[in-house]
């Protein structure tokens, strides 16, 4: 029987329910801090409040408080929003914080126990620039050993063993750094052996997802167990996205709720809106790809939590799905994207 490995133990895939496949409940995103525009420096250095929130929404990576998604206030706000997610029909959350993002397994376990939401934790490596000295020079073999131990043996958290349930997010820049190539290859090798799910984070250029999949597939990884994240900010042309879809991995639109007039992490492109995300998913559904689609928010800054004026983890359930139904998407198709596909991806399938 197939199983899914949560932080509290294994369950059968049918128990997951509605699942967000790419979220964070605690991480350190200070690496991506950007100096504020001189005109708004004082507002963005101030504590987040109603009088400064508008500036933070425009320049989210220019507020140090906003990218410190790990302090006590952030954890309290994240827990509140996980409870709201549960209230509005959420069943599971896939926590994508990997090595380099300062994953907080203790907090993830506490959330799983206190909220009743299933949490699946990831192993793997984020970009090379965010690794400490103990990880920055790891070989493919060392990474493979680490990932397999995190999944099979588990890690000690307050005297108890907690096991990771997938590899991800495995992140890379472009051109892909040699360290990141090693991480992608290690993910492919371990996926082939264990049958686990894998989640990739591409850089913000169209070529990146294609190159990642080439490295992953050459290492032995299965396409049908791999998620390509952040495609709603990476491949904007639908025809090119359809070409990428031929590789057979999951197509993930995971920035729902991110609507901004200025995308700080790639100023050469305009971030699409939730309405455009819905329209693109409908186009992909019409192309017969509903069994390859996933949806999430990738919450990683405070201003996206409701305590800070944001939308929270329940945004897709309460605001997006009703709009999709209004535009002709069926309940069966929504269940496929939010329940069936996540369960198939997360189920261990050697």
Curated annotation (Swiss-Prot):
Keywords from the UniProt entry: Hydrolase, Metal-binding
GO terms, molecular function: hydrolase activity, acting on ester bonds; zinc ion binding
GO biological process: catabolic process
Details of cofactor binding: Binds 2 divalent metal cations per subunit.
Domain of life the protein comes from: Eukaryota
Cofactor: a divalent metal cation
Xref: CDD domains: PTE
Disulfide cross-links: none
PANTHER family: PHOSPHOTRIESTERASE-RELATED (PTHR10819), PHOSPHOTRIESTERASE-RELATED PROTEIN (PTHR10819:SF3)
UniProt family annotation: Belongs to the metallo-dependent hydrolases superfamily. Phosphotriesterase family.
Protein's name in the database: Phosphotriesterase-related protein
Organism: Drosophila melanogaster (Fruit fly)
